[in-house]
């Protein structure tokens, strides 16, 4: 088989990278330069100037390091998006110029998928749940039905952006992450908001609260410790939810924030608690680099061939789930459930039990070793208490939930009716999707948010839907919260092929609209608004 050599150019934000890789996965060269702003964050124009200066210098450097000539190149690959518009344009222009001058084929690739694929190359992971976290991106990604799917993402700013912003505002400098990590080792916990909405996280409120603590005079070490622990606990929890939903047996960490040893430790502990393998590429491959662009270019060229030069424009908001990825090996290796459990969710063990001679299940919110005790105890107690209340409150709408037998706040557990039926993800069809929409509308009409509506948290018993697991539930009349609730369900449908999943969600919205009432259109519009937000443009 002929071995091809690809040169990749990266420049979505502040890091310029050029890498050379062959189709056997050998890294032949890796060169890069990072922009360090004198003050403030990364300005798109300054980033573009940085790339314009360094790309012409790094290309010959990489060629020399690889010990090859320009004629030996078989393909030019570049990061097509997502990223800063001016920066992406410099990268694309440089790649086109090089490809045309050498008469070589060209291909543009998705930056986020580049991180995942180079991570798999380096670690040997086959089909992991990946936490990709950087200055501009925070996503939980896993491959399902021919594409990389985003199971969780930020609803506002990225985790790395949160840390960098805090660093700038408090005079710690940019990037903020390394300084925050150092100061956090000397700090103690102060209470900060913990915001997980279904499979998504939000960092803007956490950032604002942390800055307020600094202005109040709280020791900077304490704020750094609390900011880091809270932000990373949110990231790991959502990754854990995706792992529980997909039942994959590999967890991978990548992106610039993976330089933080505490985040690596937390994710590794979580993976081990589920019996999953933890993977992380070597540090030089975690941040933005040209190697990942070259490697993904080779993969996509092998699958689809090169791009026509007219199709090499940038895609500033290039979503991970827009790319067909049929090359991924969806192996049959999954998590193995311990013998004593009926199920193991993201935050609870489900144990077979009984109550007055009736079949029952005990939902036990077990301590999470990756979280500090202050955060862990607070979350487990508040969620247990609220879930018990919501299980009862939601019945007023006519929605079926398990009968509640006992609540033990000290041990953070709930004893409830055992539901004999089938998980919805095993039996969903058009008609059931419509019924789901009707039932969700009933719940929302009471201003109750389920918080984690997935096909794993609904069952079909005797032809009727039963809603489970209100652990992330709360009361809210906000259209945004109701829209996010529906989007959680949409993401959980991603294990089905795109066309069918889209059809099912349309049926859900049809049932929802017919049942909800006068504000249904505002909620459905809010769904579109949330989906259109620029979460990948730094």
UniProtKB/Swiss-Prot annotation:
Q: What Enzyme Commission number(s) apply to this enzyme? A: 2.3.1.234, 2.7.11.1
Binding-site residues, Fe cation: 111, 115, 132, 288
Q: Where in the cell is it found?
A: Cytoplasm
Q: Which PROSITE patterns does this one have? A: GLYCOPROTEASE, PROTEIN_KINASE_DOM, PROTEIN_KINASE_TYR
Protein name (record): Probable bifunctional tRNA threonylcarbamoyladenosine biosynthesis protein
A GO cellular component term found in this entry reads:
EKC/KEOPS complex
Sequence segments annotated as region (Kae1): 1-327
- Which residues does the entry assign to the active site, renumbered to this chain? 452
The entry's keywords: Acyltransferase, ATP-binding, Cytoplasm, Iron, Kinase, Metal-binding, Multifunctional enzyme, Nucleotide-binding, Serine/threonine-protein kinase, Transferase, tRNA processing
Q: How is the cofactor bound?
A: Binds 1 Fe(2+) ion per subunit.
């Amino acid at each position: 088989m002929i071995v091809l050599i690809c040169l990749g150019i990266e420049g979505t934000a502040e890091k310029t990278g050029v890498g050379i890789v062959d189709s056997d996965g050998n890294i032949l060269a890796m060169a890069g330069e990072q922009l360090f702003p004198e003050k403030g964050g990364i300005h798109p124009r300054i980033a573009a100037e940085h790339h314009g200066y360094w790309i012409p210098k790094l290309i010959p450097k990489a060629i020399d390091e690889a010990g090859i000539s320009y004629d030996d190149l078989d393909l030019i690959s570049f990061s097509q998006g997502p990223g800063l518009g001016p920066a992406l344009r410099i990268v694309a222009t440089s790649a086109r110029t090089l490809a045309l001058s050498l008469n070589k084929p060209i291909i543009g690739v998705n930056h986020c998928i580049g991180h995942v694929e180079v991570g798999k190359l380096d670690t040997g992971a086959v089909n992991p749940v990946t936490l990709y976290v950087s200055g501009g991106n925070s996503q939980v990604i896993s491959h399902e039905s021919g594409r990389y799917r985003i199971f969780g993402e930020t609803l506002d700013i990225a985790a790395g952006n949160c840390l960098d912003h805090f660093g700038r505002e408090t005079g710690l400098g940019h990037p903020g992450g390394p300084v925050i990590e150092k100061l956090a080792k000397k700090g103690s916990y102060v209470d900060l908001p913990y915001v997980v909405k279904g499979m998504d996280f939000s960092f803007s409120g956490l950032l604002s609260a942390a800055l307020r603590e600094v202005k109040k005079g709280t020791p900077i070490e304490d704020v750094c410790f609390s900011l880091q622990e809270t932000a990373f606990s949110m990231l790991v929890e959502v990754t854990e939810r995706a792992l529980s939903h997909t039942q994959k047996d590999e967890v991978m960490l990548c992106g610039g924030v993976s330089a933080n040893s505490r985040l690596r430790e937390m994710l590794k502990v979580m993976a081990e608690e589920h019996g999953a393998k933890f993977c992380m590429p070597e540090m030089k491959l975690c941040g933005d680099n040209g190697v990942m662009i070259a490697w993904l270019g080779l993969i996509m060229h092998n699958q689809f061939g090169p791009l026509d030069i007219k199709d090499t424009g940038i895609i500033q908001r290039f979503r991970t789930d827009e790319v067909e990825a049929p090359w991924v090996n969806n192996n049959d290796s999954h998590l193995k459930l311990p013998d004593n459990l009926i199920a193991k969710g993201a935050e609870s063990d489900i144990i077979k039990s009984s109550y007055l001679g009736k079949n029952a299940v005990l939902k036990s919110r077990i301590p999470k070793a990756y979280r500090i005790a202050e955060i862990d105890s607070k979350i487990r107690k508040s969620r247990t208490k609220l879930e018990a209340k919501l299980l009862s409150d939601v019945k007023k709408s006519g929605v079926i939930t398990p009968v509640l037998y006992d609540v033990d706040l000290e041990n953070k557990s709930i004893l409830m009716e055992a539901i004999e039926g089938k998980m919805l993800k095993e039996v969903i069809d058009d008609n059931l999707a419509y019924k789901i929409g009707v039932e969700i509308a009933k719940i929302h009409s009471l201003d109750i948010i389920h918080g984690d509506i997935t096909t794993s948290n609904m069952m079909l018993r005797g032809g009727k839907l039963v809603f489970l697991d209100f652990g992330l539930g709360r009361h809210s009349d906000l259209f945004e919260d109701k829209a996010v609730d529906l989007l959680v369900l949409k993401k959980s449908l991603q294990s089905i092929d795109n066309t069918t999943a889209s059809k099912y969600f349309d049926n859900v919205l049809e049932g929802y609209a017919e049942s909800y009432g006068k504000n249904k259109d505002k909620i459905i519009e809010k769904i579109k608004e949330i989906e259109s937000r620029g979460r990948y443009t730094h």
